[in-house]
UniProtKB/Swiss-Prot annotation:
It comes from Centruroides sculpturatus. Belongs to the ergtoxin family. Gamma-KTx 3 subfamily. The presence of a 'disulfide through disulfide knot' structurally defines this protein as a knottin. Has the CSalpha/beta fold, which comprises one or two short alpha helices connected to anti-parallel beta-sheets stabilized by three or four disulfide bonds. Blocks Kv11/ERG potassium channels. Pfam families: Toxin_17. GO terms for molecular function: potassium channel inhibitor activity; toxin activity. This is Potassium channel toxin gamma-KTx 3.3. It is found in: Secreted. Its main location: secreted. Gene3D superfamilies: Knottin, scorpion toxin-like.
């Protein structure tokens, strides 16, 4: 789910967010971005 993406995906502060994108899409979201080292999923 959304929280599992945030927990397990580490990323640069404003950098690469490929992990977030993939994880969020698998969780049923449109994608994700990186915000202060955490993944934020787009609903």
């Amino acid at each position: 789910d959304r929280d599992s993406c945030v927990d397990k995906s580490r990323c640069a502060k404003y950098g690469y967010y490929g992990q977030c994108e993939v994880c969020c899409k698998k969780a049923g979201h449109r994608g994700g971005t990186c915000d202060f080292f955490k993944c934020k999923c787009k609903v």
